[in-house]
Amino acid sequence: MASTKPASSLIYQAWNKLSINQTIPSDSLELLGERLAIAFAPKLKEQRRNGRRRNLEYVAQHRRKIARKIYLEILEKDPNIFLPFILAVSPRACLSFDISSFLEQHQSQGRHFLRNNAEAILWGLAKKHDIDGSLHFRKLMREIFQLSPPATEAEGKEHYSLHLSTLPAIRNAFGDVIFDAIERSPTQVTARAKGYFSEKTESVWTKVPYRSSQDAIISLEVGSAIELANVLFPIATQKIVSILSACSPTVRQKNFSEAILGPDPQDTPATSSEIGMKFKVHMTAVANSTLC
């Protein structure tokens, strides 16, 4: 294995640069996005090709595979050195990088981001490269920004997705109140308006993570959201309605009138509203919401 001393120097220089700037320099964004994709993007199956092009692609794929393995090992050992590491150590350099020697000598440098727009920049890069659902990426974000862990691994992209539950099963599982709210969901209202009647619905779906069947996310699309929220969380809902009414006097009247008369199938979705730090209410003109 080649010596890690020159590479180590570059890694800690990158750490110092991030720590001093307290953000990600603009001239590093493109490179960082590419390296994040190598570390966190799903593995692609090799495509069969002939000749020189196939050989070049095989070499590039082999480099990415080795780099991905080393990058993820660094993430596991010290998340705070991960970003400087992938900025300083290229996939080509990973081929001869002595990771065991580096980890033996490495001393944690602590956190490099304390407060700024770095978190938003990283989420932006992740979305650009379609890795924002990666469990490894989310672990990185939790560690370097001290975010709360997800309630379930099903929040990532590595999950089974189940659809088309039957209406009788939904009533049996959730009872009449939830069932009636689901029957008022935009999906059900639209289906009935088009004359489509079925015992199955897209208004309930489930995500089960690949690696665990002990937890899952069950999502319900409902109508009459404020009425249902008032049943489940009466005190909090009253505060939310009060705040919304102060912003728009028509909000409370519209949602409670729909709770009585039912939603207008001609209504179109409006934007969601976020209230303070404790309440997040997703409102539409047909009063649909999602409970997880």
From Swiss-Prot:
Transmembrane segments: none annotated. Changing F179A: Impairs the induction of expression of cgnA. GO terms for biological process: cell adhesion. It is found in: Nucleus. A motif (Bipartite nuclear localization signal) lies at residues 48-70. It comes from the Eukaryota. Keywords: Cell adhesion, Nucleus, Virulence. GO terms for cellular component: nucleus. Its main location: nucleus. Residues 156-186 are annotated as: RNA recognition motif (RRM)-like domain. Induction: Expression is induced during murine pulmonary aspergillosis. The keyword Secreted does not apply. Disruption phenotype: Impairs the formation of the hypoxia-typic morphotype and restores classical biofilm architecture. Belongs to the hrmA family. Hypoxia responsive morphology factor that modulates the expression of the subtelomeric hrmA-associated cluster (HAC) containing genes that alter the hyphal surface (such as reduced total chitin or increased beta-glucan exposure) and perturb inter-hyphal interactions within the developing biofilms, resulting in a loss of vertically aligned polarized growing filaments. The N-terminal bipartite nuclear localization signalis required for nuclear localization and generation of the H-MORPH morphotype. The RNA recognition motif (RRM)-like domain is not required for nuclear localization but is necessary for induction of the expression of the HAC cluster genes such as cgnA. This is Hypoxia responsive morphology factor A.
